[in-house]
Structure formats: C-alpha cells, structure tokens
Amino acid sequence: MKTPWEFLQYSRNKIKNTWKIAFVSAFVIGLLIHLPVMLSDIPNHDGLSSMYFDQNMITSGRWFLTVACGFSSYFTIPWVIGLIGMLWLSLASVVLTETMELEDPLTIIGVSGLLVSFPALASTFAYVFTMDGYMMALFLAVLSVLFTKKYKKGWILGGVCLAFSMGIYQAYLPFAILLCVYVILLFFMEEHGVKEKVQYTLRYLGMGIAGAVLYYVILQILLKLQGKVLDTYQGINSMEQGGSGQGLLTTLKGMYYDFLAFTLHGDVLVNNIFSFAACAVLLLSVVFLLVRRMFQRKWWKNPAFFVIIILLAVGLPLLTNVILIISPNLTYHLLMRYQWVLYLILMLGFTDRYAGENGKADIGIRWAALLAAWILVFNYGVSDNIGYSNLEKKYEKTYAYCVRLLDRIEQTPGYYQG
C-alpha cells in the first residue's frame, strides 16, 4: 500500500498533460473573470430567501440538488460556493478536452476560456446559492458523454451520470445532447461501415433513454416517500402530463423562434462588432474545412451526406431548446442557455482537428480560429463584469431606498416597534 505522498506522486504521473492544462486554465481564467462576484455578497430576489436553504427542490424535479449543494453548507457563502463551482467547471473542461480529443495546448486553453467566460455562468453566479450544485450537474452531463464514447457498455454509467445531472438541474440536458451529436458526427466522418455507425449511434440513444428513465423513476419514488407532487413552477409538472398541452406545431414554432431570436438578437452570443467578427471567423473556418473534406472524401456523391446536413439544420434548434418541449411557457433565464457556448467550443475543436492537412492555409485558419476564440473570451469576460457591476449598483440603490423608506415609516405619528 502506498503512502499518501507516494499515491499523490503516482497519480500525478498518470494525469495527462492535456488534463492539467484544461483544469488549470479553466480554474485560473474563471477566477480572473468571476473573482469580483465571489468576493461580494449581492443577493437577488431569490437570494434574500435563500440565505439558508437546504435546496430540497424535489417538487421541481431536482431530487439531487440538496446533496450537490451540501458540500458548501446550506448557507449562502459566495467565496466557498464559487470555489467549489469552479472546481466542478474545471473538471468539466477536462472531460470536454478528453471527449473532443484535443491535444493542442492553446486550443485547450481557448476551450476552457470559452467555457468559464460565457455569460450564462455569470447569470448562474447571480443565483450563487445553487451555483456549485449546478456546475456539478454540468460536469455530470459532460461526463455521461465521455463514458458512452470511451467504453462499449459505458452508456450504462453514462445514463447514471445523466440521471443525476438532471436530478440536480434539468437545463443541462441540451448540453449533453449537443455534445453527443458532435461526437457521433465525427464518428460518421471517419471510415466506418453502416452497421458500426448504427451501433455507435444506438449507444448514445441508449444512454439518453436510460438516463431519462432512471431520473424519472427516482423522482417518483422520492415524491412518494416525501408525500409531495411536482410543482407548477416553470411548467415542471408537465413531465407527468406528457407535455405542455399546446399543439405540437405551436411548440415547434416557438422553439425555432426562440433559437433564432436568442442567437441573432439576444445580445449574448454576439453583442458587438468584435464578437460578431469572431463568431463569423469560427463559422467560416468550419464551413471551409467541411466543404474541403466533402470534396476530398467525395461525400457529395452520397445522398446520405445531404440528408444528414438537412437533419442537422432542422434538428439542432430543436435539440438546443429541447427543454421547451416539456415546458414551452417557462421563463427562459440566461443561466438555462449554457448550451449555446458549445457551438463556439465545438467549432474551435473542429478547426483544431481538421486544419492540419494543407500547410500554410491551415496554419492561417488555426491562427484565425484561436484569435477569434480569445476575442470572445475577453469580450464575454468584460460582459460578465458589466453585469456584476450592474448587480451591485442595483442592490445598493435598492438598499438605500429601503433605508429611506424605513426612516420615513418610523417618523410617522403613532408608529411604534411591535
């Protein structure tokens, strides 16, 4: 048996350099961007009632949230919660790196930077009392995909991870789905037979079904044990009713509309000329590499290629907004839209993977993609801190107003402390 120090030395040698780069870069960049809010205590409307809260949100379907948030205690301690949340997010970056098979250190740092700078994380920090639990849910969602990819029967363990991720917060389900789609597409782009491709796809489908079933079974058992029912909040009770009650066409139309509205006019993904240019560079790089590979492999001769392209164009908005199938009338907060950053991350990863076959042209593409990613990281970091500054000023303004209001009340004739 090894001593603690010997075990640490042994473990350090077993950890890949890519994992170390992903973890450290995510943690350091995350701290640099989000340290102001971690060192502050700025409660919002929910935070005032959550100074101490056991996070038993089983009536919202979040049966594992109380455990996930228990590591930092049930008190709202931004510094402790933020550190634990950053640890989970850094581990998620490691899993993303392994899932996407990234090797280039600068690309890994870019992926980590995008993951920890995207404004959806800043929105999560506004609800800091659940932030550590939510980041654990994100980690488990990504881990479910890695298990399914790595091992032939990994879909079983992946299903367990997905179930517990949804048991913390259901909003990260689209994150796992989009990552699955990317991994499957990469597999399809290699030389594999039809049977292998079908079996590979079924693994991910099996993981998703197993995770959803396990999540629902555990939810029903715990609801029965606690004598509770699902709440109407955010339409979560629609899970038991088989949908929202709206027509299918109306729901689908709303999903497409929301996807386009947030992507093009949400002022989050693109909020100025610099972020627009950076996103355009990433998108054009992917289109160029994909078209080039299409001609190299002569995919254009195969009708299946165009079928896949059409399915992606039709399906990606629906998969991104899959949560709206259950509850189309929910208040779609920014913290529920973390999956949008995957489009940027996956475009950067795709460029890194396939821009290495044509000398100087590909080197130029990799330079452009990396610069675009770092422009976005800086841009999102600035946006996050603008949001934090705005939160603080609004809190101080509200606090000052309440002090003046209380002073006037106390000066009213007949007032007495009861």
Where are these regions (language model features)?
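Membrane-interface micro-motifs in multi-pass membrane enzymes
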Residues: I58, R62, G85-W88, L106-K149, ...
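Hydrophobic, aromatic-rich transmembrane alpha-helices
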Residues: A92-S93, V268-P303
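Membrane-interface transmembrane helices that cradle and orient dolichyl/undecaprenyl
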Residues: A141-W155, F187-V194
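Signature aromatic-anchored transmembrane alpha helix within multi-pass, membrane-resident enzymes
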Residues: I156, R353-D384
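Perimembrane helix-loop-helix junctions
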Residues: F175-I209
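Membrane-lumen/periplasm interface segments of specific transmembrane helices
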Residues: T201-V281
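Membrane-embedded, lumen/periplasm-facing catalytic core of multi-pass transferases
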Residues: L376-G418
